[in-house]
Amino acid sequence: MRHIAAADTGDDEGEGLLVRRIKNGTVIDHIDGGEALNVIRILGISGTTNEALSIATNVPSKHMGSTKDIVKISNRELSKEEVDRIALISPNATINIIRHFKVCEKQGVEIPTVIEGSVRCPNPGCITRTNEPIRTRFAVLPDGKGLRCLYCDSVITKDLTSYII
């Protein structure tokens, strides 16, 4: 088992949070501190799923220079669309695919230039908000800190997680 240090618990003994290894599944590491619950939400994971889930929040990280969150999901590998959604809210995240207790794939997320079907347009008059069978399409702004609807040009720069489907 590997120990993952918890955020300062006031424990001078140096004991941290013990998170069990997973046999198969995905570990999402280097999530921006405080974003783990948003990651869980955008992946559609709720208390009614059968996936074993471990969450560590505000873990000190030398790599990130502050704190990070970690999410472990047993028996599930993420789709490219799910990884793209994570990149929108935590561009430093790392995705580790675990098989038989070993990391067999490790990749950093990349913010896509265009994202389809994963974000709801804030404009109630946008064609994607009608009953037309049209998937949303957003261009990621050059600074990576917002999205522009490719149908109506509405821009989202604040509270992006509330628009992720």
Swiss-Prot record:
Cofactor note: Binds 1 zinc ion per subunit.
Gene Ontology CC annotations of this record: aspartate carbamoyltransferase complex
Annotated keywords: Metal-binding, Pyrimidine biosynthesis, Zinc
Cofactor(s) listed: Zn(2+)
Entry-linked SUPFAM superfamilies: Aspartate carbamoyltransferase, Regulatory-chain, C-terminal domain, Aspartate carbamoyltransferase, Regulatory-chain, N-terminal domain
Sites where the protein binds Zn(2+): C121, C126, C149, C152
InterPro entries: Asp_carbamoyltransf_reg_N, Asp_carbamoylTrfase_reg, Asp_carbamoyltrfase_reg_C, Asp_carbatrfase_reg_C_sf, Asp_carbatrfase_reg_N_sf
Domain of life: Archaea
GO molecular function: metal ion binding
Family of this protein: Belongs to the PyrI family.
Complex and partners: Contains catalytic and regulatory chains.
Name of the protein described by the UniProt record: Aspartate carbamoyltransferase regulatory chain
Species for this entry: Methanoregula boonei (strain DSM 21154 / JCM 14090 / 6A8)
Gene: pyrI
